[in-house]
UniProtKB/Swiss-Prot annotation:
Its main location: membrane. It comes from Bos taurus (Bovine). SUPFAM superfamilies: Immunoglobulin. The keyword Aminoacyl-tRNA synthetase does not apply. Residues 19-377 are extracellular. It is a single-pass type I membrane protein. The gene is FAM187A. It is found in: Membrane. Keywords: Disulfide bond, Glycoprotein, Immunoglobulin domain, Membrane, Signal, Transmembrane, Transmembrane helix. Residues 268-362 form the Ig-like V-type domain. Residues 399-421 are cytoplasmic. This is Ig-like V-type domain-containing protein FAM187A. Disulfide bonds join 290-346.
Length: 421
């Protein structure tokens, strides 16, 4: 009996030893800060969200402060946080065109920037409230305005590398996205950003490869950046086919209740995804966004049973497109017509997640508001028209006055011929 008690006590003691608290390794203790401040190069596309970690800091520093400079040595430096590092921003509250100080967040010493814009390009510093810097980034936000779309199914090839002496300009592609639809033919694409290779880059910037940085990096001298300005980002698109994941079947009891409620007739329409209803005035524009989608996600759009493929509906494929998908995965409908009514389904990462039932109403009478962008655009066109008419009217009268003053105007009055007797 004593032997049994001893065995139990030894087992209990061993179990207690197994539950010792293991302290998590502190990354700041094993990551020394560089003795000479270098800049890590990073490139993103417009409207992307990205994170800049602060991998090193002294142990006595409990909170970091992020700083921003447009150019190295600039006298104007933005402080991107309060001096306690407690600024928080929800990504869902960020809109396109929001100020930079609204589109960022500090979490666990890292800087998060939402929906980045080209004007956000520059230098980001992680440091203290006293202005001591630990780590720095060279961020290049490339615009999607002139983005070149390449469709592999049509036999198109990406842009070729450009050579200007020792300067090489090329495109670096990201990984392929997942197929944007399942069960039917879908599409997948990869984003390509502009990079260059040159021996004339600043040595203070850390390169991804030897002498290779993004085209908008601060390491690129101004004369080299001008040569690479015509090389736009690329979008490579190809077809794909992916099976749908099997979803759990509805329980038989739930289906029995559903059949009982719907009685013996036709069952009511039950949407497979959440549907949002929206009414739009005839002739006005509309932009639909897919919930939770980002530019790097695989997003697709359908109208009822029609698939809106990028090979036909991507922005820039046809200059006169009224319905198109931009490079940020938004669906645009310009000058809404009655035939635009229907349900628009949104796919994200190969799964259909939401629908938008669009209704189109006749214009009728509605109060004019100067906050309406279409009202402002119409007033702007009217003012430009009046200004052109005024300029033409004044120019004609000035010309006539000059003619009469200097007496060199031709006489355009018809001459009357005398009748011959």
């Amino acid at each position: 009996m004593n032997l049994a008690h001893t065995t139990v006590l030894l087992w209990a003691w061993g179990s207690l030893q197994a539950f010792e608290i293991v302290e998590k390794e502190n990354i700041f203790q094993r990551t020394p800060c560089p003795a000479f401040l270098m800049f890590d190069n990073a490139a993103y596309l417009t409207d992307m969200s990205f994170e800049l970690p602060c991998p090193c800091k002294p142990e006595e520093v409990s909170a970091v402060v992020w700083y921003y400079q447009k150019h190295l040595g600039s006298s104007h430096t933005k402080v991107l946080t309060d001096f306690d590092g407690r600024v928080l921003t929800e990504a869902a509250q960020v809109r396109v065109g929001s100020d930079m100080l609204v589109r960022f967040s500090i979490r666990m010493f890292s800087l998060l920037v939402f929906r980045a814009q080209p004007e956000d390009s520059g230098l980001y510093f992680c440091g203290t409230r006293k202005g001591d810097y630990f780590y720095a980034y060279d961020v290049d936000i490339q615009s999607s305005e002139g983005m070149v779309a390449t469709f592999k199914d049509q036999g198109q090839e990406p842009l070729e590398d450009e050579y200007h002496g020792s300067l090489r300009v090329f495109t670096t592609f990201w990984e392929w996205t997942p197929c944007d639809r399942c069960g039917v033919r879908g599409e997948q694409w990869r984003i390509g950003l502009c990079y260059l290779q040159s021996p004339d880059l600043s040595p203070r910037y850390r390169k991804i490869l030897p002498n290779v940085v993004s085209c908008g990096s601060r390491a690129v001298p101004r004369q080299l950046r001008a040569k690479a300005s015509d090389h736009n980002p690329e979008l490579l698109v190809r077809s794909c086919l992916m099976p749908c994941e099997k979803k759990k079947k509805v329980q038989e009891g739930v289906m029995a209740i559903f059949n009982y409620v719907s009685k013996v007739g036709s069952r009511p329409w039950l949407p497979q995804v959440p549907i949002q209803f929206h009414q739009q005035r005839l002739g006005h524009g509309l932009i639909i966004s897919c919930p939770g989608a980002r530019p790097e996600h695989a997003v697709a759009w359908d109208k009822d049973h029609q698939y809106l493929y990028r090979t036909q509906y991507l922005k820039g494929v046809n200059g006169s497109m009224r319905v198109f998908i931009d490079h940020g995965n938004h669906l645009h409908i310009r000058f809404t017509q009655l035939e635009d009514r229907g349900i628009y389904y949104c796919w994200r990462q190969g799964e259909r997640i939401a629908g938008f039932r669009l209704g189109v109403t006749s214009p009728g009478r509605y109060p004019v508001s100067f906050s309406d962008p279409e009202t402002r655009a119409a007033l702007g066109l009217i003012l430009i028209g009046y200004m052109l008419i005024t300029v033409i009217f004044i120019s004609i009268h000035l010309c006539r006055c000059c003619c009469y003053l200097f007496r060199f105007c031709p006489n355009f009055s018809p001459r009357l011929s005398r009748p011959q007797l």
